[in-house]
Amino acid sequence: MSMYKAYKFRIYPNREQKIMIDKTFGCTRFIFNNFLSERKTKYEESKIKLSAYDELKELTDLKKENKWLKEVDSCALQKCVFHLDDAFKNFFRGNGYPRFKAKGEHESYTTNNTLNEYKSVKYESIRIDFKNKVITLPRLKKVKFRGYRTTKEIVGKIKSATISKDANKYFVSVLVEVPFIKPIINPTSVIGLDLGIKDFIVTSNGEKLKNEVRVNEKRLKGLQKGLARCKPGSKNRYKMKLKIQRLYLKIKNARKHMIFKLANKILKESDIVAVETLDVKSMYQVHSIAKHLNKVPIGDFLSVLKYKADWLGKKVININKYFPSSQCCNRCDYKNEEVKDLSVRKWICPKCGFEHDRDINASVNIMFEGLKIYMKESII
């Protein structure tokens, strides 16, 4: 059995390499937008659905018409076609319709690791030299990198590399297929998690873990006002935009660090984690909490928790979103309809008289419900 693991490094390309990376961003953006427009037009006019393989055939003709497309990595252009195809597949599963890519927004491209041969010598197109701290990438050759993983070796087969640019900094994310044997653990501890806005995580142990990341809204608002006053196309506008991007990158990295720290802490202490399935889309429609949801990375946390649990052989159990975790007394199971009101933070059970903290009570109920589901699955 094998699993995929990503390693991200910051890279330091020279002037020529930066030009090639930016040129590849432009070419992949052109291919993506061109085929997105073609798919949209053909479907609207004659209900014809194009596949990725139809577009790959057209890509060859497109490269003949536009010679500059041949200057960049061909694998990156092909991968871009498959990314568009995946975007349409996700759309038919219920996600949003694919959007046209704009210059300067989430710039990245992906290239595959291929086996090449030169003078009877076989070599891979993507290679990492930890000793000299360089990574070899198609069309870029050797690029310097730096990061906390520079002292480690990557075990497994490199499948692809994604080069990205954020706040004028360049990064590479290397996807590796690693051999994996899932650990078999006899669970001895269980925990329930109630996710929220004021307290990010409330555990069934009574612990409240707050969102440690604070967004400097005053500074962000000031920078955005400054950007609005700048003349379009001016150097000052570019500098102001870069300051905003760097602030967002700082916030993103802080949130990522917090998510991994909390996920590791929870999985270190528990073998079974029960968590409520939240309907985040519906929550965004509630005006009073929509703004606060942007500051709480609930979806990212659940994704990290799930994949880390898989790696450690632990279990994450999702509880039905309609389960009344806040309304039921965890002592006598009495259901109090009045607790539906979110302003009720503490309440006394009319049946047994026990005083409840809304979030702690919810996390305890989630834990018990998760334990029931686990026991049923174990019997089956």
Give the role of each language-model region:
Residues 1-380:
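Nucleic-acid substrate recognition interfaces
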